Amino acid sequence: VLSWDTDTVDMDLLVTEPSGEICTFSNSFTKSGGRISPDIRDGYGPEEYLIRNAESGTYQVAARFKRDRRFQLNAGVHVKVDVFTNYGRPNQQRRSATAFLEKKGDRTVVAEVTW
């Protein structure tokens, strides 16, 4: 789950699956069953990725600073990724990670999950 702290920007969630396929709003359903929520262009998010039967390997969770609707952005954008495994089950776990993106076009890996 990707969220951010500035409501005038468009951030994108990108998840690179172990196969190398990237799940994002322009490729919202992957061959391995991953899916992503519609692109959120207003507000603070969230954008979400879900996979029910995760393949073994490492998933990279990245954020991309796509657009800014302000005339000038001086402070950048803080993003937060919450990763849930075994969601809704007794053994559910949650990890959070944050990152800072300075300007439009920036992209960074915020978290990695090995399954």
Indicate where each model-derived feature is located.
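Intrinsic-disorder/low-complexity signal
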Residues: 1-115
